[in-house]
């Protein structure tokens, strides 16, 4: 993890740790001139590691975004941001996306009153995300919400009620609220040149 954040910069979905400011300087000195391919590859890796996806999963999302109407890069980011594991992370119900994925896999999370154990479940506007009524599920979420550093900077498309352990998806995310500094066009270019 630390090698990844040292090389690619801050990845809030992967870890709350930040790269040291001196390591950026060393990387720039060591790397010399970066090729266009390397720049595109690093943006793709940043996206992959932040959302915790395999190469195949990311490629699948790129294909879906390519078939949809509109900007492929924007649609790709919307698809990734509307995943259940990412929504839990953005709500502050988990400290990282892998942590959110574990909550979903262990069946602690309900969407609209039904247990969902698929982290890649695509949330829609007006979805209500809650925890199971079990004490253990509520305790896990309560700990995350209490220690969540990004509670006050909740994106516009989400609302949380920390006392009822309930989150609401208001709308599809606007590109201004993406929680990662990324140039999505470079990611799309990377995949368009691979085929």
UniProtKB/Swiss-Prot annotation:
InterPro entries (alphabetical): Ribosomal_uS4, Ribosomal_uS4_bac-type, Ribosomal_uS4_CS, Ribosomal_uS4_N, S4_RNA-bd, S4_RNA-bd_sf
Molecular functions (GO terms): rRNA binding; structural constituent of ribosome
Key words of the record: Chloroplast, Plastid, Ribonucleoprotein, Ribosomal protein, RNA-binding, rRNA-binding
GO BP annotations, alphabetical order: ribosomal small subunit biogenesis; translation
Matches recorded under PANTHER family: 30S 40S RIBOSOMAL PROTEIN, SMALL RIBOSOMAL SUBUNIT PROTEIN US4M
UniProt-listed Gene3D superfamilies: Ribosomal Protein S4 Delta 41, Chain A, domain 1, RNA-binding S4 domain
Protein's name in the database: Small ribosomal subunit protein uS4c
Domain of life: Eukaryota
Family the entry assigns: Belongs to the universal ribosomal protein uS4 family.
First-listed, main subcellular location of the protein, grouped into a coarse class: plastid
Functional summary from the UniProt entry: One of the primary rRNA binding proteins, it binds directly to 16S rRNA where it nucleates assembly of the body of the 30S subunit. With S5 and S12 plays an important role in translational accuracy.
Source organism per UniProt: Gladiolus murielae
Cellular component terms (Gene Ontology): chloroplast; small ribosomal subunit
Disulfide bonds: none
Compartment list: Plastid, Chloroplast
SUPFAM superfamilies: Alpha-L RNA-binding motif (SSF55174)
Domain S4 RNA-binding per the UniProt entry, residue ranges: 82-143
Quaternary organization: Part of the 30S ribosomal subunit. Contacts protein S5. The interaction surface between S4 and S5 is involved in control of translational fidelity.
């Amino acid at each position: 993890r630390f090698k990844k954040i040292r090389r690619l910069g801050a990845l809030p979905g992967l870890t709350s740790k930040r790269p040291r400011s001196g390591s950026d300087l060393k990387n720039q000195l060591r790397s010399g001139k970066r090729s266009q391919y390397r720049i595109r590859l690093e943006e793709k890796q940043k996206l992959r590691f932040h959302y915790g996806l395999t190469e195949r999963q990311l490629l699948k999302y790129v294909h879906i975004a390519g078939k949809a109407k509109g900007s492929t890069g924007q649609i790709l980011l919307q698809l990734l941001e509307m995943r259940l594991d990412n929504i839990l992370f953005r709500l502050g119900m988990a400290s990282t996306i892998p942590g959110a994925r574990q909550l979903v896999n262990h069946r602690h999370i309900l969407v609209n009153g039904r247990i969902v154990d698929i982290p890649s479940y695509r949330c829609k506007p007006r979805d209500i995300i809650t925890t199971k009524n079990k004490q253990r599920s509520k305790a896990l979420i309560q700990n995350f919400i209490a220690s969540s550093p990004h509670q006050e900077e909740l994106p516009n498309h989400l609302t949380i009620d920390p006392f009822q352990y309930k989150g609401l998806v208001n709308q599809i995310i606007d590109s201004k609220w993406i929680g990662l500094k990324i140039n999505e066009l470079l990611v799309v270019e990377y995949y368009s040149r691979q085929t």
